[in-house]
Design a protein with these regions (language model features):
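Beta-propeller blade signature
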Residues: 227, 281-293, 354-367, 480-491, ...
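Electrostatic cytochrome c docking/interface patches
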Residues: 25-36, 110
Length: 603
């Protein structure tokens, strides 16, 4: 998706915790830690790098243990595998801070979990149809009470510089993943800790719960099931055999099956290593038995197995077709028993008809039913914007990923619509009952590598869709951003609210861009921003009725140093009269490590 490293879009820019500093390797010599960093890592971790890797100042905010974990089992194993254990530890201690701060004993919950208000849950990324709409009864917030929101508690994530996990609220608890792979079960009202679990790699998705279990994936392509009450592992499996497969979209759970989207970081390595044989990864959706983790079916978004297509200029084999990652949570059409997924670009030639598309699979068998492509011949990877373009496909196109989830809604009278949006700034209304026939299309945003629509919109029960605009422009922090409201039936623009002038001007990583996902309740839409603000908009007019700046230090309930930063891939979660948001997105944005919980008057 051409996203920050693994995210789904502009890999290099938007993925905090997704950056993959895979620099060219040189023969191992007896080098000091500083020399090791300069020869192995500085190529990617420098100002203006093409992959959005964090700069040394950001790395120094991480614990050395977190850096070591990234080198040994996480997102930097590509470079870590070329180092000896002693070298990995030396680089980690050279870059990182002292030991991660432990969670205070006083932050442990003293009582067993209590059930939340009936129906006051937000389970996973969104409902089956990906509307990201919370009805009034479950929201517990209104147009009148939203302006009264105040911070109730803050929770700090230890040793990390990104907090990109979107919280799930279920039975009075918060389930959220962290960049270091820790999954937390917290009390929704107080933030105290019930349990933690250490996954193999970072967890950037929203966990989904069902049948007493919590399900999630990590940035090494692993999928997990834990006992929701205790955090004990029930099963763990690989969603894909490719070593560069990652899970960046939340799974969907229905009728005993877990549907998992699979994306990959092939395109990032292609940018940093011309000797890499680009590219062999294929996106997919995998159906697993939720009870056992056994694979039921696997549906690839590239139907043909990649084959050798030649050599690049340094003699490395080239492969294709490839790519077409599924970056986001799939949409379940429970009426038609169909699963819809948005796809990204081809990483190498030849291009396919399933890239930059909505693809539809049969929920029972995984059979491809149809594909509706919006941008054809879009072969692209990060080498196309890097210093060394060896692995850039011939005649690359525009990187117009459809990296967010389609929104399925009824229009009445037996008619339905599936709304899709992409990085080119286009929004489409499709007929899901006529193989994705285009009902309408609108050019809303300027688009670009980090432009257009990145992480997804929302739709309420009034026939309106709300989408946040990115249009990030490097070096121009006041450019980009905005929230737009469209009529579902026609695509007519009802209103647009431009992004306010950023208050973070002068801070590295500041931008007015608003690539974050939207959440909507009756009368109010919530949207975060690259500038670190979380805002509430009146849905009738687009007027901003509440605004909170997260770029500040917080007193955390678990005693850790906590600070907010950019809000990019993380979505607001509303349930039981509270609003939850994580803040911090390192790389080219502003780092942070905090989960914030708001309630009316802070009560």
């Amino acid at each position: 998706m051409g996203t920050t490293l693994w995210s789904r879009f502009p890999f290099w820019l938007l993925a905090p915790g997704f950056w993959l500093p895979l620099c060219l390797c040189v023969p191992a010599l007896a080098q000091s830690p500083e020399e090791l960093f300069q020869t192995r890592c500085a190529q990617c971790h420098n100002s203006g790098n093409a992959v959005g890797a964090p700069l040394p100042d950001t790395l120094r905010q991480m614990s050395w243990q977190a850096i070591l974990t990234a080198l040994e089992t996480g997102k930097m194993t590509g470079i870590g595998d070329t180092l000896s254990p002693a070298q990995r530890e030396a680089i980690s201690k050279f870059l990182g801070t002292a030991a991660s701060q432990p969670t205070l004993p006083s932050s442990k919950c003293s009582a067993v979990p209590q059930r939340g208000k009936d129906g006051a849950d937000w389970n996973g990324w969104a409902d089956a149809a990906n509307t990201r709409f919370q009805p009034a009864r479950s929201a517990g917030l209104t147009r009148v009470t939203t302006p009264k929101l105040k911070l109730k508690w803050a929770f700090g994530f230890s040793g990390v510089t990104s907090a990109f996990g979107t919280p799930t609220i279920f039975d009075g608890r918060v389930f959220v993943g962290a960049a270091d792979g820790t999954v937390y079960s917290l009390d929704a009202r107080t933030g105290c800790v019930y349990w933690t679990y250490a996954a193999v790699a970072g967890v950037r998705i929203s966990p989904v719960l069902g049948n007493g279990s919590v399900y999630f994936g990590d940035l090494r392509g692993n999928v997990y099931a834990l006992d929701a009450a205790t955090g004990k592992q029930i099963w763990r499996t690989r969603a894909d055999e490719h070593p560069l497969a990652v899970i960046t979209g939340s799974p969907k759970l229905d009728s005993g099956r877990l549907y998992v989207p699979v994306s990959g970081r092939d395109e990032s390595i292609a940018a940093t290593n011309p000797a890499y044989e680009c590219c062999t990864f294929r996106g997919s959706v995998v159906a697993l038995d939720a009870a056992t983790g056994t694979r039921v079916w696997k549906a690839y978004t590239v139907l043909d197995v990649p084959k050798a297509t030649g050599q690049n200029k340094v003699g490395a084999k080239t492969w294709g077709p490839s790519g077409v990652a599924v970056w986001s949570s799939p949409t379940l059409d429970l009426q038609a028993k169909v699963i819809y997924a948005g796809t990204g670009v081809n990483y190498s030639n030849p291009p396919t008809e399933t890239s930059d598309a909505i693809v539809a699979f049969d929920m029972d068998s995984g059979r491809l039913l149809w594909s509706r492509q919006f941008t054809n011949s879009d072969s692209y990877n990060f080498a196309c914007v890097g210093q060394d373009k060896t692995n850039c496909p011939k005649d690359p196109f525009i990187d117009a990923d459809l990296g967010n989830s389609g929104i399925l809604r009824s229009l009445g009278g037996g008619k339905r619509i599936l709304v899709a949006s992409d990085k080119s700034g286009m929004v489409y209304g499709l007929d899901p009952d006529r193989e994705g026939a285009i009902l309408w299309k609108q050019k809303i945003a300027s688009g670009g590598l980090n432009g257009g629509f990145m992480w997804g919109g929302a739709s309420d029960d009034q026939g309106i869709a709300y989408l946040g605009i990115s249009d990030f422009t490097a070096g121009k922090p006041e450019v980009g951003g905005g929230l737009v409201a469209l009529q579902l039936a026609t695509g007519k623009k009802l209103w647009t609210t431009p992004a306010p002038k950023p208050t973070c001007l002068g801070i590295a990583g500041c931008s007015a861009a608003q690539p974050a996902p939207v959440t909507v309740i009756p009368g109010v839409a919530f949207l975060g921003s690259w500038d670190g603000h979380i805002r509430a908009y009146e849905t009738k007019t687009g007027t901003i009725i509440w605004d909170f700046d997260t770029v500040q230090d917080f007193q955390s309930v678990n005693g850790l140093k906590a600070h907010g930063g950019s809000i990019n891939s993380m979505a607001p979660t509303v349930a039981g009269g509270m609003l939850y948001i994580t803040s911090g997105y390192s790389g080219t944005a502003m780092p942070g490590n905090v989960l914030l919980a708001f309630s009316v008057d802070g009560k």
